[in-house]
UniProtKB/Swiss-Prot annotation:
An annotated GO cellular component: cytoplasm
CDD domains with a match to the protein in the record: UBA_EF-Ts
Protein name: Elongation factor Ts
InterPro entries registered for this protein in UniProt: EF-Ts_dimer_sf (IPR036402), Transl_elong_EFTs/EF1B (IPR001816), Transl_elong_EFTs/EF1B_dimer (IPR014039), Transl_elong_Ts_CS (IPR018101), UBA-like_sf (IPR009060)
UniProt function note: Associates with the EF-Tu.GDP complex and induces the exchange of GDP to GTP. It remains bound to the aminoacyl-tRNA.EF-Tu.GTP complex up to the GTP hydrolysis stage on the ribosome.
Top-level taxon in the UniProt lineage: Bacteria
Length: 307
C-alpha cells in the first residue's frame, strides 16, 4: 500500500477541486495512483473532467520563431527558473528555435544541426552551456508548422524576452485572403489556445482510449437507469465534452457566444477567402514532467547528522 502523504492529497485536490477527505479516500482506494483517483472521484460525481494538462514541474523556456509560411516552437528545460533569466541561456534558446524553423522541426534534427555561426552542433553547444552555467539542461521537444498560403500566428504567454516565455502557441491558418487580417485573427486564436488548452482540433484528433474513458465515466455515473437512457445521457455528455476540449467547438475566448469554427466562418468575408484552421501547437513549460521535490527538513537533518 502506497503511503498517502499530505502532498499527494493536496495535488489531487488542486487537480480536481474535491474535498480533502474525498481526495484522501480516493487515493486510499486506488493505492496512491493520482490518475486512478481522479477517475474514482469523477465516477462519484466529486470532481470535474480533467484536461490532459501535465503537472508543470520543470523550468527553462519555450520559444517560438516564424518566417513567412513557416513557424517553429521549442522547449528547452533547466533545473531552476533562475536560468531562464540568464542571457546566455536565452540566446541559446533563441538560436535553437531558428534551427527548428530551418530543419524539419524534430528535436532530433535540431540537436544534430549546426549551431548558427559556429562549427559545433546544437547538442554540443548545449553541453558547453551546461558546463558554463553549472546546471543540467535538456532539449525537450520542438515542432514546425507550415502552410502553402496564409499565416502561422504565434503567441507567447509569460514572456521573459521577445518570443520566449512559459507558454508558446502556433496557429496555422490556410487561406488566400488578406494576410494582415489573417494575422490578427490568428493571434486571437493563439491567445485562445494559450488560455483554454484544447486537446485537439476536433473530435477526430482525440485518441480512442480517452473517448472510451470519458464515456465509461459518464455511464457509471448513471448506473441503475435503463441502458437506452444511459446511452442517450452518455451521447449528450460526450457532445459537451467535445465542446470543452476541441478547439473548433470551444466557445471563443474573446466572444463566448460563438465557437471558434463560427468565428473562422464569419471572418471569411472580411478576409476575402475561405479560411482553414490547419493545425495548432501549444507548448507549456514543463508540462507532463515530474520533478522530484526535496524534503528540506529531512535534508537539514541529514546534513546535521553528517557533520
Amino acid at each position: 500500500m502506497a503511503a498517502i502523504t499530505a502532498g499527494l492529497v493536496k495535488e489531487l485536490r488542486d487537480k480536481t477541486g474535491a474535498g480533502m477527505m474525498d481526495c484522501k479516500a480516493a487515493l486510499t482506494e486506488n493505492n496512491g495512483d493520482i490518475e486512478a483517483a481522479i477517475d474514482w472521484l469523477r465516477k462519484k460525481g466529486l470532481a470535474k473532467a480533467a484536461k490532459k494538462a501535465g503537472r508543470v514541474a520543470a523550468e527553462g523556456l519555450v520559444a517560438v520563431e516564424s518566417s513567412g509560411h513557416y513557424a517553429a516552437a521549442i522547449e528547452v528545460n533547466a533545473e531552476t527558473d533562475f536560468v531562464a533569466r540568464n542571457a546566455d541561456f536565452q540566446a541559446f534558446v533563441r538560436e535553437a528555435a531558428k534551427v527548428a524553423l530551418n530543419t524539419d522541426g524534430s528535436i532530433e534534427a535540431v540537436a544534430a544541426a549546426h549551431f548558427p555561426g559556429e562549427s559545433v552542433t546544437v547538442a554540443d553547444k548545449l553541453a558547453t552551456l551546461i558546463a558554463t552555467i553549472g546546471e543540467n539542461m535538456t532539449l525537450r521537444r520542438s515542432v514546425r508548422l507550415t502552410v502553402s498560403a496564409g499565416v502561422i500566428a504565434t503567441y507567447v504567454h509569460g514572456a521573459v524576452s521577445e518570443g520566449q516565455g512559459r507558454i508558446g502557441v502556433l496557429v496555422a491558418l490556410e487561406s488566400q485572403g488578406d494576410v494582415e487580417k489573417l494575422s490578427t485573427l490568428g493571434r486571437q486564436i493563439a491567445m485562445h489556445v494559450a488560455a483554454l488548452n484544447p486537446l485537439a482540433l476536433d473530435a477526430s484528433g482525440i485518441d480512442e482510449a480517452t473517448i472510451a474513458r470519458e464515456k465509461a465515466i459518464l455511464l457509471e455515473k448513471h448506473q441503475g437507469k435503463p441502458a437506452n437512457v444511459q446511452e442517450k445521457i452518455a451521447e449528450s455528455g460526450m457532445k459537451t465534452y467535445f465542446k470543452e476540449v476541441t478547439l473548433l467547438e470551444q466557445p471563443f475566448v474573446h466572444d463566448g457566444s460563438k465557437s471558434v469554427a463560427q468565428v473562422l466562418k464569419e471572418n471569411e468575408g472580411s478576409v476575402g477567402a475561405p479560411i482553414t484552421l490547419k493545425g495548432f501547437v501549444r507548448y507549456a513549460l514543463g508540462e507532463g514532467i515530474e520533478k522530484e521535490e526535496s524534503d528540506f527538513a529531512a535534508e537539514v537533518a541529514a546534513a546535521a547528522g553528517q557533520s
